[in-house]
């Protein structure tokens, strides 16, 4: 396939990617009680890189403590323990020749106030989306 560029190297800003295959972010709601991602989630992301993906997006990572969480099980990267959990994953993804990309996430109006640490929803609009 002479016109197929899927498996050819690609430059993305300063990064040279081995191909154009990326693993889309998946919000799996699989973190522990303290919002540290479980080991099986981290292993899953590393395996995607080891199996040939050039870009591996994390699942949705909550942006702050009080307002971004919208439902149970969301990972964060705010405390040192959370940062330390993500650090080896990024290193292993890079060691496999892939680029680790974090999906920064804020739930906004779609959040559940009962699971948000602040007990409220913060969003740019007061209009609730249709359910």
Where are these regions (language model features)?
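Non-globular sequence segments
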Residues: 91-94, 99, 105-131
